[in-house]
């Protein structure tokens, strides 16, 4: 089982979870929002104040790729706790801004 399959299996109770392959790695969506990236078999969850409060000291800041914004790098042992990781992803989705719609170019 691949890392992305394992993570999506762990998030089975979270509605509207989807993945999209990007640049050889994966973006994890909850609804229309990108809530995390999976790069080099590691989960990087977008940082929100509410997510940081929930996680406490259970993460280190990491970068999914060179030039990326800092994210919460989640250790494998924390991924095993389905309820915990589902709650973190839900909190993250609830506290991220709505994605901006791309403006159509007028030619």
Question: Which ranges hold each PLM region?
Answer:
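Charge-dense, helix-prone N-terminal extensions
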Residues: 1-107
């Amino acid at each position: 089982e691949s890392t992305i399959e394992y993570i999506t299996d762990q998030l089975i109770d979270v509605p509207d979870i989807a993945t999209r392959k990007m640049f050889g790695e994966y973006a994890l969506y909850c609804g229309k929002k990108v809530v995390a990236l999976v790069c080099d078999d590691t989960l990087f969850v977008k940082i929100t104040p509410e997510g940081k409060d929930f996680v406490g000291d259970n993460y280190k800041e990491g970068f999914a790729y060179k030039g990326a914004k800092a994210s919460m790098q989640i250790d494998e042992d924390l991924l095993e706790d389905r309820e915990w990781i589902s709650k973190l992803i839900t909190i993250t989705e609830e506290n991220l801004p709505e994605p901006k719609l791309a403006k159509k170019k007028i030619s």
